């Protein structure tokens, strides 16, 4: 099975940086994707051990994120709930054309490799 996603959009909530007990870092950010038709959709993104710039993402920043889709379950208020999110493996400001091209090429390579 293949689980590859690429999202291009605008940061709609400032990045939240979390220091994990293991010493790692986690950034949570929401990216809003606007289609030419239909309503905008907001995608939650979690990025483990991201580059330093990811923790400074502000509302309005245009980004490209590649990774995988994950649905996780947790208990809140005594009720089991779930959240579907993108777990980022790579990301870049949209303005960095070279980085964006590398991210897209890597995603294409993964998809082509799965087709072989």
Model-derived segments and their meaning:
Residues 1-116:
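Single-stranded nucleic acid-binding surfaces, predominantly the OB-fold ssDNA-binding core
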């Amino acid at each position: 099975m293949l689980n590859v996603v690429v999202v291009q959009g605008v940061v709609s909530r400032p990045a939240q940086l979390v220091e994990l007990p293991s010493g790692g870092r986690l950034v949570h950010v929401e990216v809003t994707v606007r289609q030419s038709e239909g309503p905008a959709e907001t995608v939650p993104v979690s990025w483990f051990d991201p580059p330093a710039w990811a923790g400074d993402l502000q509302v309005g920043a245009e980004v490209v994120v590649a990774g995988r889709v994950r649905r996780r379950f947790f208990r809140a208020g005594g009720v089991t709930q779930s959240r579907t999110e993108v777990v980022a493996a790579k990301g870049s400001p949209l303005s960095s054309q070279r980085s964006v091209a590398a991210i897209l090429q890597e995603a294409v390579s993964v998809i082509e490799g799965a087709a072989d």
